[in-house]
Regions:
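Active-site neighborhood of divalent metal-dependent phosphoester bond hydrolases
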Residues: 5-137
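Conserved Walker B
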Residues: 1-2
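Alpha/beta-hydrolase fold catalytic core
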Residues: 113-171
Length: 171
C-alpha cells in the first residue's frame, strides 16, 4: 500500500477510512514502514513514506498497519502479498502467519522487528535467513521465514528455498 509512489500517506488514510469495507494484507513495503517507525532503522533515500512518519495521525496509521494480517482466508483462496511455500498446507500458512501477527500485536514489537531485520548487526545480513523451511527452526527463524515468504519472496524453488534478488519479468 505504501512506498509505491508519492501518495503513501493519502493512500493509507483512504484505506483506513474505509474501515470494515476494505481489508488488506501486509506487504513488504508496509512492513518496511513499520520497521522504520518502531526501530532505529532510518528510511532509505528512495522511500516515499516519510510523510507518514511525520504526520499527526502517524500513531493511528501505524497501529492500523500492525493490526493487518499477513494472510486473508477467503472462501476458496488465501490472499498474501508474495507467496506460500510449497511445503506448507493451508493450516501451516495460517498458523505461521498468526504467530507473526501475534508478535506484531505484542508488547515488544520494536524488539521483534529489530530481530527480524538484523538491525543490531546489519553485517550479518540475517533478514533473508533462513531461506529454507524446517520444523526444527527456532521460533525467531520461523517468524523471519514466514515474513519473507508471505511478504518478500520473488520466487520459491520446489524445495522451498526463497529467492529475493530477481526483480525483472520472467521470460
Amino acid at each position: 500500500v505504501v512506498n509505491r509512489g508519492n501518495k503513501s500517506l493519502e493512500t493509507l488514510r483512504f484505506i483506513y477510512s474505509l474501515k470494515e469495507n476494505a481489508n488488506m494484507v501486509l506487504g513488504n513495503h508496509d512492513f518496511h514502514l513499520l520497521v522504520c517507525a518502531l526501530t532505529s532503522k532510518k528510511p532509505n533515500l528512495k522511500d516515499t513514506f516519510t510523510d507518514i512518519l511525520r504526520s499527526p495521525d502517524r500513531y493511528t496509521l501505524i497501529e492500523y498497519l500492525l493490526s493487518r494480517p499477513l494472510i486473508l482466508e477467503l472462501q476458496d483462496a488465501l490472499l498474501v502479498h508474495a507467496g506460500i511455500p510449497p511445503q506448507w498446507n493451508t493450516s501451516d500458512a495460517l498458523h505461521n502467519a498468526k504467530l507473526v501477527h501475534q508478535k506484531l500485536q505484542g508488547n515488544d514489537t520494536g524488539q521483534f522487528l529489530t530481530k527480524m531485520f538484523g538491525i543490531i548487526d546489519s553485517s550479518l545480513n540475517t533478514w533473508y535467513k533462513p531461506s529454507y523451511w524446517s520444523d526444527e527452526l527456532s521460533e525467531e527463524e520461523k517468524c523471519r521465514y514466514t515474513i519473507n515468504a508471505l511478504m518478500r519472496m520473488r520466487f520459491c524453488k520446489e524445495n522451498g528455498e526463497l529467492e529475493f534478488k530477481h526483480k525483472m519479468h520472467v521470460n
